[in-house]
Every structure is written in structure tokens, then in C-alpha cells.
Amino acid sequence: MIKKLSLFLSFLMALSLSSAVFATSAERDEGIKCISKGSWQTALYDKDRNGRDVYTNIRVGDSYKGGQCMGRCGGACGGWAPSAWTKDCLDHDICIVDQNGENGLAWDKNCGDEFNHAADDYTFGVWRGCRG
């Protein structure tokens, strides 16, 4: 059990490190950066993997063009499990709404790199205290 958990954590760490290597000059994996619900943040994503950078000012937790709970890691707004509120998840959320994300996952042609940046936030954000 511990060996499997260790292998899984190693995989996630490698995934987060590899996504930082392929980021554009302005857009980077910010690690796990907690953000507070209700605060104003500037979301950043690049169009079409390494394309033009897009910046959007938004209040964390607000709805945006039909998307809800901007900045909350994971799908939807509710649920029984605690969730993290982070900058990388905000970047991914805004990208998915603006670019009509195909599936929101790592292989999404527009927002896959943002998904990779947010993967460690989703997995470890609550442990790091990013509860909004």
C-alpha cells in the first residue's frame, strides 16, 4: 500500500515538473498557490498550447460565462469532500470556459497544459491548507 502510494506521488511530482518545462515565458505552473474565495486574481492561460497569453481579472468563486466556482479545484461547486482553491485551478477554469474546452483533461488541445499545472493543486491543495 505504501509502495503504491509512493509510486503515485512520484508520478504526480514528475507530471508537475514536466508541465513547468513546457510553459511559455509568462505562463507557468505556480506550484500550489492558495487563493481566497472573494479575492480578486488575474487568471492566465495560453491559447492553443504555447500560443498568445490571455489574462482575465476575476473574483475567486464567482461565476464566469456560465462556469461556476472559478478557482475551486475539481468539477462542480459542491460535494461532500473538501476542495482546494488555487491559482492554477483558476487558470484552468477560465481557460476551459473561454476556449470551450473539449474535455478539460490533460489531452485537451487548448487547456491541457493548464490541467497539468493544476493537477498537484487538486491532489495536495487541501493538505496545504488552500480551503478558500
Q: Predicted segment positions?
A:
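Extended terminal accessory/targeting regions
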Residues: 22-132
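Bacterial N-terminal signal peptides that target proteins for export
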Residues: 1-9
